[in-house]
Amino acid sequence: PKMYPGSRYANRMPIGSIDVIENFKPDELRAYYKKWYRPDLQAIIIVGDVNVDQVEATIKKMFADVPAPVNPAKREQVSVPDNDLPLISIAKDKEASNTILYIFYKHDKLPNDLNRTIAGLVKDYIQQICASIMDERFDDILHQANPPFIYAQAYDDDNFMIAKSKGAWTVAALAKEGEIDSTLTTLVKETQRVKQYGFTPSEYERARINVLKQYESAYNERNNQKNDAYVREYVNHFTNGGYIPGIEMEYTLLNQIAQNIPVEQVNQYIQDMIGEDNIVIGLTGPDKEGIKYPTEENLLRTFLKARQMPVEPYKETVSNEPLVPTLPTPGRITETKTGQRFGATVFTLSNGIKVVLKPTEFKKDEIIMTATSPGGSTLFGTKDIDNLKVFNDVIEIGGLGNFSATDLSKRLAGKKVSCALSLSQDSENVNGMAAPSDLRTLFELIYLSFTAPRMDEEAYASFETRTKAQLQNMELNPMVAFSDSLSKAVYGDNPRASRLRPQDFEHISYPRIMEMRKERFSDASGFVFTFVGNIQIDSIRPYIEQYLATLPSQGKIEKGNPAEVPSTRKGDYMNRFNRSMEIPKVTVANLYTGQMEYNLENIITATALKQVMDLVYYEKVREKEGGTYGVGVSARISPFPEGRTTLQIFFDTDPAKWEQMNTIVRNELKLSLIH
């Protein structure tokens, strides 16, 4: 009612009401089906390796006798009236764990007859540019010491939430508890900064080449597109309209568009979108004692006040210096083995590192890199358990070399490349990918990850405050409470199995985490790098010699400590707890653990068991009993600790049915194991 006054949506959402579900008459459903499920509103989409003529003939034969309706009901879009003053909506939910603030700037949509032409592509290009630059500015704020929000973004998806008759330029943020006003003020000021001064040429250039890179990658992979991607595009075209020329034509047109649209045209568009009227402000958050929310009047007052605050033009400094300013003397490839397993080539380098190369033709525009070394988090003692909880999130927030994380992101504009370090229980890992044209950059990032980690206390302070704010109300989510209960039931009070909580930051040390990173990643001994994809071995050799053969290597290789992995509870154990919910349901998890030899036969057997039980439960529990939307099954044999087995079966169901459904689940498992 608050967001859609004067519209049908003010009284009822498109999904309907619970009253209809609980009290409908069968004839009403039949009448609805007859009214709307009809040939002129339906489409059949088939994508795959099929005989087109045969499939078309089959479709015509099967559906030819479906009659066209006489005097069919007209499908109309629900209109959304304009508003002069900002509309305010505040909603609280007992199960919500985040406070989310939205500002919608409603606008008319591009008419359908234009949206299906090149005008629609131009509009989408400009919208993508605007959203990309705004998100980059929000990211800069997030890396400051104490940002008012946890996350923020801007977008325009041509719909005003559920309403397809209006579009809306949308700015949204996850606000920290107690900082709703400051979050709203920041969003408004950044929006006004764009309205008054627009985007800078350098911002536009970065966004432009990033968009072009995305289209270039899609074009290069045009022959490797999956069937479901085509289906999604056709469904979207049928339901929402627009253009669908194919990636070849779209890529050609977009290159022309990007070269001919100046930053001034982009600025004019976004400044027109940020209007003085047709504004809606939405606020949702936890219904929890102690959380104070502004009144609608106060929220409006904050918005209007922020809109009048003076703002300065956006300023930034962007470095174009080399990622690796001083290159080391290249190392050597001391041994080459060709024709290895799966047709791979294996290099041994002068520093002892091994490199596995496997050229493939599955994707033209992608090279995948993984690197692992034995060791892992289990080599750290009890005093570092809390540090380990955030280790993978924290070790790269400072950036690399001479670049902060935000500066590095800007420096990599227009490149399809990524590289990330992580620590698992028994290994150190480096994962990355690149387009063949950006392969050198991937090697530079690998080299910097080992040799030039960068600390940024301000970025860490931001991470800590945002993470603590996000964790503050996690327990309000019933599924988080269930996960906590399940973890305790399986692992007891083992601190290595507990999730991160706000109070853990009292024992977390950023300097210590960076020391831990150095302990595990400053020595590349034991690492095996594997590159798979569109590789030319002669072209990649110089990069291997320059960037991998020069990594520091002291010859020290360690193995993870399986004794530090939390052990599972022995024997039968049931943990049942109640939690009040607005929409009652029961979540059931059956967990079975054991031990078996870790080998390929047993791994395949476990996979087969999971797939068989998926089919059995779909038929018996979902289709026959109507007891759940689906039963999830996972079956795993762990390589570390070696041979530990876990079979987990979980489902949601009606409180009145859970015991009956769980009996079926357990009985069907027993029958499957017998056979």
Enumerate the language-model features and the residues they cover:
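Flexible, low-complexity linker/tail segments at the boundary of structured domains
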Residues: 37, 521-522
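Short Ser/Thr-interspersed hydrophobic loop/turn segments at strand-loop and sheet-helix junctions
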Residues: 613-614
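Proteolytic maturation boundary segments
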Residues: 43, 51-139, 143-145, 205-209, ...
